[in-house]
């Protein structure tokens, strides 16, 4: 929770929580878990944008928040030839100030953008998200039931990004890699493990990725927009 909520929440009748786990930090407050409101796009299905690379390879969405993330960008650049060789399709959201020409010879499977307004469509239709772990991103991944590799911003206040990432990692829906542990080798080995093909009843599938998807489906989520409205209406009548 933020400092205002942490120190003055006890004065409120109730504090509405984005994560159940936040309750342990607000022991003197009455709390209700509602989830966090998201952009409207996340509450409906969106088709994959036409500009996304076509093909049968797994689709990765790599992003670092509105300002991008230089550490994530750098690892992606270092591993790009490996990813293309493995037939991944990559949409790389680099952030406003980080766009630069970067091409892999003879490949149309990599697209770089400063930002996009179609992030819901990308997350809903991709196979894996690689990202920082701000609260908004965590809730978007939960709503879309999407597996991820999360690399928390190491200088976030009270290390909250790592705590956010631990929620999904503990559920088995995400792999958490701290930035100081991240390297080209660790990144590539993690992807190879997640996308290792296993045969079952004559059909090939990604065993680890499928398990991560199932774990994300089991995560608690609430349509928070309606849930919060319900409590606001109730409190207005009561008080």
Descriptions of predicted regions:
Residues 1-47:
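Active-site-proximal region of nucleotide-activated glycan assembly enzymes
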Residues 10-11, 121-125, 143:
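Alpha-helix C-terminal capping/helix-to-coil transition sites in glycosyltransferase folds
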Residues 43-131, 162-166, 170, 177-187:
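Donor-nucleotide binding loops and adjacent catalytic segments primarily
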Residues 124-139, 146-147:
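Acidic donor-binding loop of glycosyltransferase active sites
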Residues 131, 147-158:
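Short hydrophobic beta-strand element within catalytic cores of glycosyltransferases
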Residues 171, 176-178, 182-207:
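C-terminal "capping" alpha-helix adjacent to the active site of nucleotide-linked donor transferases
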Residues 204-222:
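A short, well-ordered alpha-helix in the C-terminal region of glycosyltransferases
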Residues 221-239:
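C-terminal alpha-helical cap of glycosyltransferases
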């Amino acid at each position: 929770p933020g400092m205002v909520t942490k120190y003055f929440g006890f004065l409120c009748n109730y504090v509405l929580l984005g994560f159940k786990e936040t309750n342990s930090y607000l022991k003197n407050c009455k709390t209700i878990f509602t989830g966090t409101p998201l952009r409207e796009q996340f509450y409906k299905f969106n088709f994959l944008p036409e500009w996304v690379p076509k093909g049968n390879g797994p689709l990765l969405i790599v992003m670092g928040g509105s300002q991008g993330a230089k550490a994530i960008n750098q690892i992606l650049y270092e591993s790009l030839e490996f990813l293309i060789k493995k037939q991944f399709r990559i949409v790389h959201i680099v952030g406003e100030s980080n766009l630069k020409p970067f091409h892999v010879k003879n490949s149309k499977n990599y697209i770089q953008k400063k930002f996009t307004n179609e992030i819901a469509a990308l997350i809903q239709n991709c196979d894996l998200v690689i990202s920082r772990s701000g609260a908004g991103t965590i809730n978007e991944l939960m709503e879309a039931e999407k597996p991820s590799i999360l690399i928390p911003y190491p200088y976030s206040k009270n290390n909250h990004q790592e705590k956010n990432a631990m929620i999904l990692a503990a559920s088995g829906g995400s792999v958490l890699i701290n930035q100081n542990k991240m390297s080209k080798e660790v990144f590539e080995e993690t992807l190879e493990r997640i996308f290792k093909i296993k045969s079952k009843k004559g059909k090939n599938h990604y065993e680890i990725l499928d398990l991560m998807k199932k774990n994300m489906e089991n995560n608690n989520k609430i349509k928070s927009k309606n849930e919060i409205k319900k409590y606001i209406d109730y409190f207005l009548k009561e008080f």
